[in-house]
Amino acid sequence: MAKIIGIDLGTTNSCVSVMEGGEPVVIPNAEGSRTTPSVVSFQANGERLIGQVAKRQAITNPEKTIISIKRYMGTDHKVNIDSTEYTPQQISAMVLQKLKADAEAYLGEKVTQAVITVPAYFNDSQRQATKDAGKIAGLEVLRIINEPTAASLAYGLDKMDTNEKILVYDLGGGTFDVSILELGDGVFEVKATNGDTKLGGDDFDQKLIDYIAETFKAENGIDLRNDKMAIQRLKEAAEKAKIELSSATQTNINLPFITADATGPKHIDMNLTRAKFNELTHDLVQRTLEPIKKSLEGSGYAMSDIDKIIMVGGSTRIPAVQDAVKDFTGKELSKGVNPDEVVAMGAAIQAGVLTGEVKDVLLLDVTPLTLGIETFGGVSTTLIEKNTTIPTRKSQVFSTAADGQTSVEIHVVQGERSMAADNKTLGRFTLSGIAPAPRGIPQIEVTFDIDANGIVNVSAKDKGTGKEANITITASTNLTDDEIEKAVNEAKKFEAEDKKRKESIEVKNNADQIVYQTEKTLTDLGDKVSAEDKAQIEEKVKAVKDVKEGEDLEAIKKATEDLTQTFYGISSKIYQQANPEGAQGAGFDPNNMGGANAGNASAENDKKDDNVVDADYKVEDDK
């Protein structure tokens, strides 16, 4: 059976995992890292860079480097690159394509299906957008799963015989969630969830960026935030300082030649203490506490009922965050999971549940936000309460607001406000053909259906005439089927171009290596090579050099192969002359002289070392 991968599509970093031998395993990327920056960059030559290589060149290419696109999922935000507009779904799909390719390289087989995680507090539009991104990337998204729920799966897989109530505190790069779950006998039941989709590590970075920029402006009269290259350098410095202050009480921010004016170049060289960082970000930390309170209220539990607090997301490494959660809950924090990888591992476990590889596990999730429709007076009338276990289906009968009304518009909303206008509009549709009657007489049954992905379907039926209308919610910010199809084709085109570009680099590098080794060996052999043979080899070397700067890969391959075979034959003749007894020498093969195969051997050695991982988290036995 083909493997289904689990993907944590993060704001700042993403991670991919797969089940192997009944356990979730994190798949390293092509660069050898276990997480991949969710960064996409477009180069002047049309090439796309994704992940760490894209992040590395962001300073020199800030206008065409896209970061934190997840924050715009489910909105009508567009990114304009060289007069081409890209939706958040398309940019996210590029990151997913990279994760998919890395998984295929690791597994040695094609990957077409995935489970993808989203913040628990994502609304319907954001979930649909995530599913669309998967489709554009060539993945069938079998399930959308909430990030804290995925984390609880990874935490609880080896604790199936225990009964625990856990609180998952998930502070990532751009979003924040709290979920309360009950674990017991293989059942993972979400009791309540709350959060903020606009709060994460990016906001902590921004506080530092503003502080550094304001300090510099006060001293030099220049606002660095107006310089795109300078602001990118500030972003990198802020992120680095934040990470360093998780283990040190002070760090130095040193940015030479950050800008210049009439008096000459300007530099930044300042010390930042952890105490100052805590002061700057205090309000952000405090914002994470209210969702804890609300999720407890929604679950019906008291804090004393909670057995474990699981910290998820890279931003939970911030000491002030850990201290605030400890003080607020009065409990020690469980550090038995890797905050960067646990969500992807949980997604892989859910994939295992779907394939039957993981047995005796039942996941019961909830809808994070209240669902309803607009009724007379603009009121939002609830059909499905937040924290209702999904999948679920609920119906309610409504009537007309005016005499003789023959059609009604169903305005579907999601949110906690009492007025429809204050909530998120998911969609509108019209039920026509209602028999004319005095207001209040027709009976219109509205049914909400939420699937296991948290995606909403709504139908309306006139019980008198039997007329029916329904929609799968597709908000104006979601892509149409035609737009998705177009994006899929563009993604395939990009993928083909990337593949061709990679092959071109490999073929040309191999040609360079063969030419170098041939010329070096020819020099080393000296007069052992006859003038006739030497001329023949030099002719073949010239043939490779003539074609290797072009784009005809088949011609380069053929010229390289001709050179290899020619030299192989001549070197064999030299060895035979040196050993007239007839013992066969090994023969010269340029491919084995530190070229491509040597690289492969190195890669094999690296692969053997994949199990040696530097970890910065503490493993505890939580049993």
UniProtKB/Swiss-Prot annotation:
Alphabetic keyword roster: ATP-binding, Chaperone, Nucleotide-binding, Phosphoprotein, Stress response
CDD domains tied to this protein: ASKHA_NBD_HSP70_DnaK-like
Chain intervals for the UniProt region annotation (Disordered): 580-623
Domain of life (superkingdom): Bacteria
Disulfide cysteine pairs (residue numbers): none
Biased composition, class Basic and acidic residues, residue ranges: 604-623
Induction pattern: By stress conditions e.g. heat shock.
Modification sites for Phosphothreonine: T175
GO molecular function: ATP binding; ATP-dependent protein folding chaperone; unfolded protein binding
Annotated Low complexity bias: 591-603
Gene3D superfamilies: 1.20.1270.10, 3.30.420.40, Actin, Chain A, domain 4, Substrate Binding Domain Of DNAk, Chain A, domain 1
PROSITE patterns, per database record: HSP70_1, HSP70_2, HSP70_3
InterPro entries, per the entry: ATPase_NBD, Chaperone_DnaK, Heat_shock_70_CS, HSP70_C_sf, HSP70_peptide-bd_sf, Hsp_70_fam
PANTHER family recorded: HEAT SHOCK PROTEIN 70KDA
Function text: Acts as a chaperone.
Family designation: Belongs to the heat shock protein 70 family.
Protein name in UniProt: Chaperone protein DnaK
Organism: Clostridium botulinum (strain Okra / Type B1)
The gene coding this protein: dnaK
